[in-house]
Structures are given as structure tokens and as C-alpha cells.
Amino acid sequence: LFLTGANIGFMPAGNYLGQVLGGQSSRWLLIPIGMLIGYFIVRAEPAVYVLNKQVEEVTDGAISAGTMGAALSAGVALSVGLAMVRVLTGISILWFLIPGYLFAISISFVVPKLYTAIAFDAGGVASGPMTATFLLPLAQGACIAVGGNIVTDAFGVVAMVAMTPLITVQLMGLVAQLKTRKARSAQPLLDTAALLAELPDDAIIEL
């Protein structure tokens, strides 16, 4: 049933939309429109919904489903935008994948391990059936419209979608870690200020 719906609905629609957008005089609009589509299409992934809920339950709400969804949406939007740049310019995918994975692996040494594990799971989940059945035909249709090479320029969208959540989710973890450290460093100052406020006016403090 899913394959029938994908072949009849998603794939032709994605291909047609890509050709329409690529056939416009302002071809650069492919980039922001592709990013917008990527931002919302990941919300339709059933596996993404399940992952977000599981992460929220396991972390007792420390990482909310909404925060996870926003990080994944931002990652997929970025990946689709970069894919449209490839379609328009013909840049090799290696110029994106190699630096991207190197950066993702590099920050994994400073990010809490929980976020690193979640990020790698999120990368696999985000590149699910909706990506393969809609975003890939979208890139193929756009590539046909701009006269590019489908084999070298259109393919690789799924790989990009699998990579960017590794970066966005880990960056989310890095921000959370920095906020935690800042809060801990400020706590002793707050405790001292509260203690001084409770002392009577004639109290003598020995140094």
C-alpha cells in the first residue's frame, strides 16, 4: 500500500514540483523553497515522531520532543538547501559530506555522549521513506529543469539528510552543556548573596 502511494503520489508530485521550480526564471528560489519543504517534511516521518517521544521519555523531559523536532527540522532544511545548491552549481557532494562528517565527529568529543548517540540515531531516522519518495524526486525534477546531470547532481539528497542531524542535534547538546556550566558557575554567587541578605545589619563578618 505504501509503495503504491509513493509511486502514484509522492514521487510524481515531487518530480513535477522540482521541474516547475527549476523552470522558473529565478532559479535561486529552489534553495529557500527546498529548505522550507525540508523543514516541514521531516515532521511527517512516523519514525521521527517515535524517536522524539522516546527521547523525551528517557530523559524525563530534559530533551523535549519539540526541541528534538526543531533540531531535526533545521538539519533537514539545511541539507535540502545544500542539495539545491548542488543542483544549481554542480558542486561535488564530497565537498559537503567530508567536511560535514569531520565536523560532526570532531564535536562529538566535547558534546555529552547522550546527545552524540541521539544524533546518530536521528540521522538514520530523518532519512526515512518521506525523504526517499519526495525529496529525491524533487531534486531530480529540478536537475532536469536546469539541465544538470541527474546522476552526479540530483542523487545524494538522502546522504545529506542523514548527515545534518548529526551536526544540529550535537550543537543543541553543546548549547545545553554551556548553559548548564554557566548556571553552575553562577549558583555559588547567588548562594552567597542570599546568605548576606539574611544576615542582620549589625552582624560582623570575619574574613
Model-based region annotation:
Residues 2-9, 81-82, 132-149:
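Hydrophobic alpha-helical transmembrane segments in multi-pass integral membrane proteins
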Residues 28-108:
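Helix-loop-helix junctions within the multi-pass membrane cores of secondary transporters/permeases
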Residues 155, 159-184:
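Membrane-helix cytosolic exit motif
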Residues 5, 82-105, 118-127, 151-158:
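Transmembrane helix-loop boundary segments of multi-pass membrane transporters
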Residues 25, 145-163:
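Structural signal for the N-terminal portions of transmembrane helices
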Residues 54-62, 174-207:
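Intrinsically disordered, low-complexity non-transmembrane regions of multi-pass membrane transporters
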Residues 53-61, 108-123, 180:
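Alpha-helical transmembrane segments
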Residues 2-16, 42-47:
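Transmembrane alpha-helix boundary signature
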